[in-house]
Amino acid sequence: MHNNFYQEDELLNNELSNRGVLLTKVDDVIGWARSNSLWPMTFGLACCAVEMMQAAASRYDMDRFGMLFRPSPRQSDLMIVAGTLTNKMAPALRKVYDQMAEPKWVLSMGSCANGGGYYHFSYSVVRGCDRIVPVDVYVPGCPPTAEALIYGLMQLQKKIKRTTGFKYDARKNH
């Protein structure tokens, strides 16, 4: 009985694909669209921001991954925290993060953003931006190369594709 069902299902799929019809899950389509159309907002705080600019320039060309830098948090779904986060700047980071629309992701770039880095023991430095905002991907290095940033972005794309469920609460965003 089960064998017959799977054979009929396979025949139907083959017949539809011959007619140019694609069968897939909504979660897969949403994951594909979200991962290939990230709009990052820069939060460049130190020297890591220079490497982020290099990754966006013509040699590495982040646009080919569907990424378009946006100046406003309301138009962004990815925040790249690049550099040393100080105690004075932490509330601004949280405020900008809260202004971003759902779904949103954070990439922590460099040793200083990941854990305080060279300034870890300074009284004025936050020991990792994950104490202020939830971080999805960490890119190590001081400063990390443009290749490392692009690799981190590719890992984030994989993570987004694995995310299931179309979660949207109109009451929360209204």
Swiss-Prot record:
One of its GO terms (biological process) is aerobic respiration. Keywords: 4Fe-4S, Cell inner membrane, Cell membrane, Iron, Iron-sulfur, Membrane, Metal-binding, NAD, Quinone, Translocase, Transport, Ubiquinone. It is an enzyme of class 7 (translocase). It is found in: Cell inner membrane. One of its GO terms (cellular component) is plasma membrane. Its cofactor is [4Fe-4S] cluster. Its EC number is 7.1.1.-. PROSITE patterns: COMPLEX1_20K. It catalyses: a quinone + NADH + 5 H(+)(in) = a quinol + NAD(+) + 4 H(+)(out). InterPro entries: NADH_UbQ_OxRdtase-like_20kDa, NADH_UQ_OxRdtase_20Kd_su. It comes from the Bacteria. GO terms for molecular function: 4 iron, 4 sulfur cluster binding; iron ion binding; NADH dehydrogenase (ubiquinone) activity; NADH:ubiquinone reductase (non-electrogenic) activity; quinone binding. Binds 1 [4Fe-4S] cluster. [4Fe-4S] cluster binds at C47, C48, C112, C142. The keyword NAD applies. It is a peripheral membrane protein. NDH-1 shuttles electrons from NADH, via FMN and iron-sulfur (Fe-S) centers, to quinones in the respiratory chain. Couples the redox reaction to proton translocation (for every two electrons transferred, four hydrogen ions are translocated across the cytoplasmic membrane), and thus conserves the redox energy in a proton gradient. NDH-1 is composed of 14 different subunits. Subunits NuoB, C, D, E, F, and G constitute the peripheral sector of the complex. Belongs to the complex I 20 kDa subunit family. HAMAP family: NDH1_NuoB. This is NADH-quinone oxidoreductase subunit B. It comes from Rickettsia bellii (strain RML369-C). The lineage of its organism: Bacteria, Pseudomonadati, Pseudomonadota, Alphaproteobacteria, Rickettsiales. The gene is nuoB.
